[in-house]
Design a protein with these regions (language model features):
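Active-site-proximal beta-strand/loop segments in catalytic clefts of secreted hydrolases
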Residues: 17-18, 42-44, 65, 129
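Generic N-terminal helix/loop capping motif
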Residues: 30-37, 42, 65-69, 94
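Acidic Gly/Asp/Thr-rich repetitive segments characteristic of extracellular carbohydrate-active
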Residues: 1-39
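Right-handed parallel beta-helix
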Residues: 48-171
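A common structural microfeature
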Residues: 10-12, 36-39, 44, 59, ...
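Intrinsically disordered, low-complexity segments enriched in small/polar residues
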Residues: 4-8, 23, 43, 56, ...
Length: 171
């Protein structure tokens, strides 16, 4: 992933709200904008997702290090990379088990991407998931660096019983 450009040279979108309703200023709104982009944060705190969040438009940098104070945490639903040329830096992901159990979706991973290329996940922490915390499989040119992937919820309602893993990655 050393040649990944993410949103370099594109538009800059500011996250000004911790809401997850897709309105202007939310992370969901910014991720839905087309074109090359960098997403910066003017707020800090936890974004409690109302549904799964897909990074489905590539050529994006999510710059969590721009958040003031204690930074940004994304919680309650999975975040999935479904595009190429994506950089995610200085973010926290906490799936938890509240919505997993309510939706009967014990295969959810906290964060990750499958079968993509040109990804960088840097200085992120991913924990409290009941399947895998971070899954990065079948990708090309992918770097996961300086990340903390830990504390899966082993006895938290998975259909296989005591089941949970920190990470799951490979080519």
């Amino acid at each position: 992933g050393r040649y990944v450009t993410g949103g370099r040279g594109g538009n800059v979108y500011h996250v000004t709200s911790l809401a997850d309703d897709g309105s202007e200023g939310t992370l969901r709104w910014a991720l839905g904008k087309s074109g090359v982009k960098t997403i910066v944060f003017d707020v800090s705190g936890t974004i409690h997702l109302q549904s799964s969040l897909d990074i489905s438009i590539g050529n994006v940098t999510i710059a969590g290090q721009t958040a003031p104070g204690d930074g940004i945490c994304v919680a309650d639903y999975p975040v999935s990379i479904k595009a190429n040329n994506v950089i995610v830096r200085y973010m926290r992901f906490r799936l938890g088990n509240k919505n997993v159990l309510a939706n009967g979706a014990d295969g959810w991973d906290g964060f990750g991407g499958f079968d993509q290329q040109d990804l960088v996940i840097d200085h992120c922490s991913v924990s409290w998931s009941i399947d895998e915390c971070l899954s990065v499989l079948g990708n090309k040119n992918t770097t996961v660096q300086w990340c903390l992937v830990a504390q899966s919820l082993v006895n938290s309602g998975h259909s296989k019983g005591a089941h949970a893993y920190g990470g799951n990655w490979g080519g």
